[in-house]
Amino acid sequence: MRSHISVMGKKEGMIHIFDKDGSLVACSVIRVEPNVVTQIKTKESDGYFSLQIGAEEMNAPAHTITKRVSKPKLGHLRKAGGRVFRFLKEVRGSEEALNGVSLGDAFGLEVFEDVSSVDVRGISKGKGFQGVMKKFGFRGGPGSHGSGFHRHAGSIGMRSTPGRCFPGSKRPSHMGAENVTVKNLEVIKVDLEKKVLLVKGAIPGARGSIVIVKHSSRT
């Protein structure tokens, strides 16, 4: 049941590729190195079933690793074989999906060999503090004829009743840098030799960011 286990990968960018019908499609490139199981949580020990997986092993000298990684984290990873990883993620799973998985097991793109679509989760690009026109698509005001109301939100209140502005209205605020999941992306190619997964369309995050890929919840 490893096809239902999530794995971490790194977004390499986007390319164009011809599909089997000869159409040119835009694809996101995800590099998936082997993910290693560093912890197994069960119903008896933690109240639910999940795996903690590690990716991108740190190959720095021991004295450098001790400076960059906390002692509790080093002690935790020592129980799983002593390998230190730059990224750790916990992925939920059912008892059936985690059956036969043990500490130190490694898996990568082979879990997607017979999969037609996947869900990809990542952190979207941060845009900083933005106004309502960029963030929410507001129309704004007139651009000329003496108007000073160009990129404002407009009225957000009422009269003396209720005498206040309701919370939750669309206002200028921070944009991006949020967890985003894109579902049901078609798998174009699984290249086990190059450790690359090609999916149709865009995925969240900047080039080089970490994404989590799992079997699509819609299939």
Curated annotation (Swiss-Prot):
Keywords: Ribonucleoprotein, Ribosomal protein, RNA-binding, rRNA-binding. It comes from the Bacteria. The keyword Signal does not apply. InterPro entries: Ribosomal_uL3 (IPR000597), Ribosomal_uL3_bac/org-type (IPR019927), Transl_B-barrel_sf (IPR009000). GO terms for cellular component: cytosolic large ribosomal subunit. One of the primary rRNA binding proteins, it binds directly near the 3'-end of the 23S rRNA, where it nucleates assembly of the 50S subunit. Belongs to the universal ribosomal protein uL3 family. This is Large ribosomal subunit protein uL3. The gene is rplC.
